[in-house]
Amino acid sequence: MLKIGVQSNFWYDRENPLASFEYIKSCGFDAVDFNIDNYLSTAKLNKEGLQETFFDQSIEEILAYFTPLKEAPEKTGVVISQMHAPFPAYFGGNEEVNEYIRMAMDKCFAVCEYVKCPAIVVHPPGGDTKEEEWENNWDMYQKLIPIIKKYKGVKICLENLFTTRPNRLEEGKLCAAEDQVKLLDTLNEEAGGDYFGFCFDVGHAILLRKNIRDYLVTLGHRVTILHLHDNNGVDDLHMPPYSCLANGRHHVCNWDSLVEGLKEIGYRGVLAFETFRVYSAYPADVRTDALKLIASIGRSWSKRIEGEE
């Protein structure tokens, strides 16, 4: 059985990690996507300038702060399978802020190693042209190579993103699966090892009307982690799978395509759900049941991916 994960937003209590992990385990999950991005607003730094943040603490202080988080998996068996780094992670023309973000990333990677988290999403930057987007991605990620190489068992994951334009959504100019393959392979060649992987966000693929199975098959072994959630094809809703119907009849997303694609590439990572909107969509007294339903969907998919059904 593949592990079933969910992001930490809303249910995680910073003051009591152990109780939080015990709660999410009771909901049927055995993995967590930890939102370390909540500890730094990079957009605020870019807008207002450098200021003191959580990451100005020494690495010793930060690891001490996260010691209860490290102990929670050891006591519950619920692993931290992935993290989400602060984002945006790059601001063109603002090297002062970019340098600060790299310092924060260094400490995020250290936390990953400390809590035995093997993957962290670092959002790729955009650009006005495909060439500019490549240059921005190369500038950001290649500067992270000497940093990530300091930490054992931690991989940086890129993600398929989109940009919101007036009355439309625009795919990231390097988000075609073939372009991601080229970028990932080039980065790993530069790094001299397997330091970069891919986070496939199915919700973003829905918005951009991608053929999910084909996308996954093209990425193949590079698919390291997942962001699983549903939407109506218009808004990035982050709802549980099977929530959205087209014309009240058919699912907006072809979920069979997702399961078949993961099965075809031999995916054996965590089925990680990024479904935080259940906390605003549902009343407080049914949120636990909603989380249990999400975990049940994950177990159903796991059986199909591993060929048990």
PLM ranges: what are they?
Residues Q7-W11, N35-Y39, A85-P88, P125-G127, ...:
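Active-site beta-loop-alpha junctions enriched in small/polar residues
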Residues I24, V32, P73, C112, ...:
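Conserved, mostly hydrophobic/aromatic
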Residues D30, V79, P118, V154, ...:
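Short acidic/polar active-site loop segments enriched in Thr and Asp
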Residues M1-Y114, G193, G197, H221, ...:
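N-terminal pre-domain/capping segments
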Residues F55-M83, M140-Y151, V181-L187, N254-D256:
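Alpha-helix-loop-beta-strand connector modules within alpha/beta enzyme cores
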Residues D13-R14, F21, L50-F54, I59, ...:
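Gly/Pro-rich active-site loop or hairpin
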Residues G5-Q7, S81, I120-V121, C157, ...:
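Structural detector of well-ordered beta-strand residues that form the stable sheet scaffold
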Residues E74-K75, A89-G197, L207, D285, ...:
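Active-site acidic/histidine proton-transfer and metal-coordination neighborhood
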